[in-house]
């Protein structure tokens, strides 16, 4: 069956790996996510992943607690490295070939980020996991997703969250909140909808790189998106 996308960038938050736990990596949760990824890989869509680290350490929180913000952000990057290795390991157990490329060098453990190599690995059918954000403090992993997505020529950034799209208001607080099927970047800015942080959002808008926000908790959602079905919210130019 033909797919809607040839190459996609999946943004996974660190918190998504926790499942119902308060901290760390929930093995059952990561295995379920990998099963979803496996379905997409089998369809022939090239998949890259940018992973966060908030389940282990958040640079913003460290900065707020009195730690030097740059130091806290570097600690957050190391947290993403741990998540990337866990994800790669789970993929290996599921029979998926995956490579981790890091914006911070840790040569004994992972490959450094090299754009042509990443593209070649995607073309070979491997999943490429980008770790350590952009490699610079003060930039979120959402911004890393926008950056890497632009660099590798992804057709869409798939932002995996615990909510099934972008809503007019917080659905947990406002029962009348409605989900947008599609919305433009300018509309989202005008309505002050928090899809991504401002830097990431601006980069996607400038590069005309659409964002699809969807629920990673919803079974089969990732596969349905790749097959072109209506899932979550599409943010477009």
Swiss-Prot record:
The catalytic activity of this protein is classed by the Enzyme Commission as: 2.7.4.22
Gene3D superfamilies found in the cross-reference section: Acetylglutamate kinase-like
User: Where would one find the signal peptide in this protein?
Assistant: none
Activity regulation details: Inhibited by UTP.
Subcellular location(s): the record lists: Cytoplasm
UniProt binding sites for UMP: 53, 73, 134-141
What CDD domains does the entry give? AAK_UMPK-PyrH-Ec
**Catalysed reactions listed for this entry:** UMP + ATP = UDP + ADP
Q: Enzyme group, top EC level?
A: transferase
Answer yes or no on keyword ATP-binding.
Answer: yes
What GO CC annotations are associated with the protein?
cytosol
Family note: Belongs to the UMP kinase family.
Q: What is this protein called?
A: Uridylate kinase
